[in-house]
């Protein structure tokens, strides 16, 4: 989808896509990091519909005991990787807005916007590193 949009908006020479685990980044000074980390907690993971459990790898779903393991990691590591005023866009679970905003603010981020998904649930936080 990202590559299609890159061509559609004719920005092939202005964007560099990097698809890698956040722990493996070696350089810093990025303008933008977009992350969709696993954010489902252990209890909710066991309650997921079979069609989700059977078609999605557990590693793509499980956010640890409280669902925030990878959210915390992405926020902390992004703080080191982003340049000043760089943007972090992160997807969250619909009940994770309050704690996610708290973690972001504790790590020096300004909250620009919280977007909702198609069912009206909080789903994505756009923030700026201060």
What are these regions, as identified by a protein language model?
Residues 1-130:
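S-adenosylmethionine
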